């Protein structure tokens, strides 16, 4: 029985890990263990060492109060990997945690095969990480087509597999969905996402709600949909909705339907923007972090945009309102502009689809299938 140890530190990584486990399950002689969430637990006989929310932090300053806790979890994870006598370690994204674990494990188990999935964004900042990863990992799976050369040139085996998020079944029949959700013909639907972490949600909530309040005065038939990453998030959001003048509903298990049925979205920057674009829905992206974290990022970063669609296009296909521009009046003005102009909304969808086509798959097989095949044939 071969044992694979997975580590995923956030929902997107859990999603990727779950799909890869699904594709590996056809091999009966495999056992899966490690750290993951709902997707990985549902995909196989997988029990997480601890909940992924324990290591799901973002930002340079925001993470400081949790450093001691994270160090203890790194120690616990490394000890668990060593004691589990695993045949392969696979880390997924969350480099702040996964790289530190892999580096420690490499010292204790120099012959263990270690794979990382989701290449660090060395093309955006801290290019030296490519060399660091080459010292630790045996193979890197990249989700973006332009990433492998950054790593192969320093001696790390890097394979482009495509973006697993795009493996999902996206809904494109808006008419059928409007009937399912009992949406009147004269209603406009705005989908709003705040983020996956509590800190992100609380940071964006007052800004986004104020922006919605502003546009709802001009759009009386506007209905807001809040797709929930986790059911607990409803309790975080609800206090901000006590005196609002717009109609809204929460959806906890039909995120992709919420994206697809909407006429427009206001989205916190992240993986969800890919899902919204793949659903054929135009959007406005906004994002804000701790002010000190922001200046550190600005010092390090080499790119102009935060949305992957815009980064790959090299232009602002999707309007972005970042940090000091993440203000309710600016956001509401852009939302009004798009709500009142179907041609601009359609243009964004068309241009986004061109970029998404480049991200879909490295072959006619899904990214998870490709990853699983490489793992089975070359690392087990």
UniProtKB/Swiss-Prot annotation:
InterPro entries: Glyco_trans_19. The keyword Transferase applies. Coiled coil: none annotated. One of its GO terms (biological process) is lipid A biosynthetic process. It catalyses: a lipid X + a UDP-2-N,3-O-bis[(3R)-3-hydroxyacyl]-alpha-D-glucosamine = a lipid A disaccharide + UDP + H(+). Pathway: Bacterial outer membrane biogenesis; LPS lipid A biosynthesis. Pfam families: LpxB. Keywords: Glycosyltransferase, Lipid A biosynthesis, Lipid biosynthesis, Lipid metabolism, Transferase. Its EC number is 2.4.1.182. It comes from the Bacteria. Signal peptide: none annotated. It is an enzyme of class 2 (transferase). GO terms for cellular component: membrane. One of its GO terms (molecular function) is phospholipid binding. Belongs to the LpxB family. HAMAP family: LpxB (MF_00392). NCBIfam families: lpxB (TIGR00215). Condensation of UDP-2,3-diacylglucosamine and 2,3-diacylglucosamine-1-phosphate to form lipid A disaccharide, a precursor of lipid A, a phosphorylated glycolipid that anchors the lipopolysaccharide to the outer membrane of the cell. This is Lipid-A-disaccharide synthase. It comes from Rickettsia typhi (strain ATCC VR-144 / Wilmington). The lineage of its organism: Bacteria, Pseudomonadati, Pseudomonadota, Alphaproteobacteria, Rickettsiales. The gene is lpxB.
